[in-house]
Amino acid sequence: MATVTAALVKELRERTGAGMLDCKKALESHDGDIEKSIDYLREKGIAKAVKKAGRIAAEGLIFDEATPDHKKAVILEFNSETDFVAKNEEFKEFGRKLVKIALERNVHQLEELNEAQVEGDKKVSEALTDLIAKIGENMSLRRLAVVVAKDGFVQTYSHLGGKLGVIVEMSGEPTEANLEKAKNIAMHVAAMDPKYLSEEEVTASDLEHEKEIARKQLEEEGKPANIIEKILTGKMHKFYEENCLVDQIYVRAENKETVKQYAGDIKVLSFERFKVGDGIEKREEDFAAEVAAQING
């Protein structure tokens, strides 16, 4: 049997919201496999929702910007070890400079950005090494997305002082009214964290996985087989409402309208949402010791 560590219990607790003892039991019965433990907790109805992102840990900032004509936008995650360095003006200036490079040159991948010239003959990767040496803390360019509008426009939104950024690509013309509407939709993406744009983006495997979880929940509740299939239809509709951007209830709506309805005669074509540290493991803090004490106690 795999050793169930305090860190594993902590992660499972963060991702499911389940109690500490439930998390410990789930991990012990599934040899420390966190994904299987999540499914088990959901099947038992102990975990009502799962945060797919996992641990949120690394410090840094999200930089985003669009061209004046709103035909191209860039979003970049630039990480540091501490929040103190993320507030450093040299750190912020370097991030802004890199976004400008990606916006103004033919840069679409992080590898291309690292190879781009930033100061004379110096590459971005070399300039970053210099900055690390100067400030005395490790930093990294984690991810980059470049969105080019073919038949519509793009809009950006930054939240939490640069800790979260969003790009939305829309159909239509970048009129003042449409840009305002697009920014509101980007704010919705920041707040509601949709996993897909629409039902069409949900893969068959993802859908089947959700159905299986729901089916086992209903079986645990003792529902008869003929009723389960009917209930599953409603549960899948709810899944789309909660996870697909265009089907979500618009966060500022007063009349329960969906994002698609709010968008009206323009359509959401794609979106990018970056939050600092999504999925990066952080150093264990005192909470891990607390968990360990309860496991071993």
Curated annotation (Swiss-Prot):
Disulfide bonds: none annotated. Its main location: cytoplasm. Transmembrane segments: none annotated. One of its GO terms (biological process) is translational elongation. Keywords: Cytoplasm, Elongation factor, Protein biosynthesis. It is found in: Cytoplasm. It comes from the Bacteria. Associates with the EF-Tu.GDP complex and induces the exchange of GDP to GTP. It remains bound to the aminoacyl-tRNA.EF-Tu.GTP complex up to the GTP hydrolysis stage on the ribosome. This is Elongation factor Ts. It comes from Fusobacterium nucleatum subsp. nucleatum (strain ATCC 25586 / DSM 15643 / BCRC 10681 / CIP 101130 / JCM 8532 / KCTC 2640 / LMG 13131 / VPI 4355). The lineage of its organism: Bacteria, Fusobacteriati, Fusobacteriota, Fusobacteriia, Fusobacteriales. The gene is tsf.
